[in-house]
């Protein structure tokens, strides 16, 4: 499998590059960061999958470039609205390429979200507190936003 990593100089992107390089059955097709062209990379070095850890403000342009560039997308970038997701579904249908969006790739955080969702059924008050390094790009984080959404799924309202 050929993989391009978009946002390869960030913490998560660099981790994915390191992982791909350590595997015998996965080839690094491209390593893209700010100033590089994802479209040019996909044209000159096609990939089966693009793993994206870029910035929320370019999320839709990036996903469109990946799908219409002939690759499936694994997206760790946050900030997608319901309308964005509907548009992405249309692109997936049109291109026949898959798109997986996850606001957090850490198993412990995914479990924490499920625990918070379940606990929300039993409480009338909840608070999400985050602590991040000083270079954190998105605040509140996609993880916090998704956790809050999950907690409110069963018609719960928290102020």
Residue ranges of each PLM-predicted region?
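NAD(P)-binding Rossmann-fold cofactor-contacting core
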Residues: 19-40
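Active-site-lining helix/loop region of Rossmann-like oxidoreductase modules
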Residues: 1-18, 29, 120-159
């Amino acid at each position: 499998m050929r993989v391009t990593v978009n946002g390869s100089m960030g913490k998560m992107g660099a981790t994915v590059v390191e992982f791909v390089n350590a595997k015998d059955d996965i080839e690094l097709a491209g390593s893209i960061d700010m100033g590089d062209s994802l479209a040019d990379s996909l044209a000159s070095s096609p990939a089966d999958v693009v793993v994206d850890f870029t910035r929320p403000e370019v999320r839709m342009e990036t996903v469109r470039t990946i799908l219409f560039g002939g690759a499936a997308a694994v997206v760790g970038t946050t900030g997608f609205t319901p309308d964005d997701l509907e548009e992405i579904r249309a692109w997936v249908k049109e291109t026949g390429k898959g798109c997986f969006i996850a606001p957090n790739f850490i198993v412990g955080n995914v479990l924490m979200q499920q625990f918070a969702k379940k606990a929300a059924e039993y409480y009338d008050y909840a608070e999400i507190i985050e602590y991040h390094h000083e270079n954190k790009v998105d605040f509140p984080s996609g993880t916090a936003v998704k956790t809050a959404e999950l907690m409110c799924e069963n018609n719960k309202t928290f102020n």
